[in-house]
């Protein structure tokens, strides 16, 4: 394993080890993008069953983070790393382990999942999905992370060949690397959370009510995806047909070629189940109504975002969605008139559906009703990877995690049944042993 000389490399290694052991190896169907790729091969080749057993026993059943972290630190594959750490670094690594172990607590209100929203990527990107309702103003303390102050040299070298963002802290007056589970939270122009901080710890605070199954998002910055986020591909921009989706939206509605579908296209669309065809949801209709009335997205940069933090990328790099930019730039815009027609909007979403999924089969989960892509599954009533992973870990259907409550309920029912049986038994015994009345005495 490579010697880690800098504070940045040490904490980057911590995060890579934690994501490798506590996400990738815990029934996760994809692979988390690593920060520096410093993880030793012996750690990458570790068997997942021992890690899952620790999570099941000490986190899901006993909710004991300390004991779980203690058992993980005893893996012999971690010895080369632990021997090089000072006592302070060991405490920091243990604390980082607990951040990721907290993801599996029964009280945790979210789940690390994946999304195909950004179809430039060759694989699904990580995202955070709410498992329970989260009220506005509530701190999502388990969705936290650590900020690492960067030197100018580290800022120039960070993420070479990668696409990692960094935080700018006005309090620290420095660029900082953002590590921990909260780094999986994606950007949205109409975000439902904002950053909150205490010391070097950072977490998310809910700014509006979040429903179960809704993605937890935050606002990065006003110019993170180009000038005024003109290249943004978030869910809100997709529903509005603006920014990165603007060219595709206008082309879908104005191009005459789009209206004349080939028979193969029609057959492909009709072969999809009704639930898999795009139907304008009530949530999308509300977005359309806002647009029709001349409304705009909420200004998260001024109202929802903690002013201390905003996300940037190094100046020598650009965040480029290469495939989307190429696809959208190749489409000629023939008309720039406002598009307020619901039919145009439906056509835009259908075209986007085809571009995002191609000819791959799309299924609808039998449990959570979310659509997903899995070419290995033959049964259209299959469960999505999120629900399969959840069921393996908690032995309960998503989103329920409270296994302890279920066991207490079963024990209580068993106790009631036992008492009922005792009452019935004593009653029958009293009838059998009741003395006969002597009428002659």
Swiss-Prot record:
Give the chief site where it resides: nucleus
Q: What class of enzyme is it?
A: transferase
Q: Kindly state one GO CC term assigned in the UniProt record.
A: cytosol
Phenotypic consequence of residue 220 to A = Loss of function
One GO BP on record is:
mitotic G2 DNA damage checkpoint signaling
Cellular localisation: Nucleus; Chromosome
The similarity annotation says: Belongs to the class V-like SAM-binding methyltransferase superfamily. Histone-lysine methyltransferase family. Suvar4-20 subfamily.
Q: CDD domains this protein is in?
A: SET_Suv4-20-like
The enzyme's E.C. designation:
2.1.1.372
**Known role:** Histone methyltransferase that specifically trimethylates 'Lys-20' of histone H4 to form H4K20me3. H4 'Lys-20' methylation is apparently not involved in the regulation of gene expression or heterochromatin function but participates in DNA damage response by giving a 'histone mark' required for the recruitment of the checkpoint protein Crb2 to sites of DNA damage.
> Can you give the residue ranges of the SET domain?
108-221
Keyword Nucleus in record: yes
Keywords attached to this Swiss-Prot or TrEMBL record, sorted alphabetically, are: Chromatin regulator, Chromosome, Methyltransferase, Nucleus, S-adenosyl-L-methionine, Transferase
Q: Which reaction does it catalyse?
A: L-lysyl(20)-[histone H4] + 3 S-adenosyl-L-methionine = N(6),N(6),N(6)-trimethyl-L-lysyl(20)-[histone H4] + 3 S-adenosyl-L-homocysteine + 3 H(+)
What this protein is called in its record is Histone-lysine N-methyltransferase set9
SMART domains assigned? SET
- Any Pfam family from its record, for instance, is SET
